[in-house]
Regions:
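A positively charged, amphipathic N-terminal helix/segment that binds anionic biomolecules
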Residues: 1-122
Length: 122
């Protein structure tokens, strides 16, 4: 029976990374270890409630505002209502997800260049 060992050593040391890569990795760790992450799209709607006596039924009056987060899950579009109390936190979590995705894109490009044989451009 042949035994294989899995090395948990990093592919390269921190000192071998460019300053840009160290900064990107550091920010990614901050985002992952800090507050929440939420993947989806922020949607704000204006709608009437349907009551004839409500201000939203009057022409020219402001309608009711509601906020939702949409995302694809298992091939289906799902929506989640966001209350007024949750809006600031939810927006921040969506922003964290977007920032993390941008960081990953930049790291993927650095590593793509490394595999390609050239050193990554900073």
């Amino acid at each position: 029976m042949r035994r294989y060992s899995l090395s948990m050593k990093p592919d390269f040391t921190r000192s071998a990374m460019s300053p840009r890569e160290r900064k990107l990795r550091s920010r990614a760790v901050q985002l992952l270890s800090g507050a929440g992450l939420l993947h989806g799209s922020w949607i704000e709607r204006q709608r009437g409630c349907g009551r004839k006596t409500c201000h939203c039924a009057q022409p020219g009056d402001p309608r009711h505002h509601s906020t939702y987060v949409y995302r694809q899950h298992e091939g289906k579009l799902r929506q989640l209502y966001v209350s007024k109390v949750q809006r600031e936190t939810t927006r921040r979590w969506l922003d964290h997800d977007s920032e993390l995705h941008e960081i990953l894109q930049a790291l993927w490009e650095i590593h793509w260049q490394r595999v390609r044989g050239g050193e990554a451009k900073d």
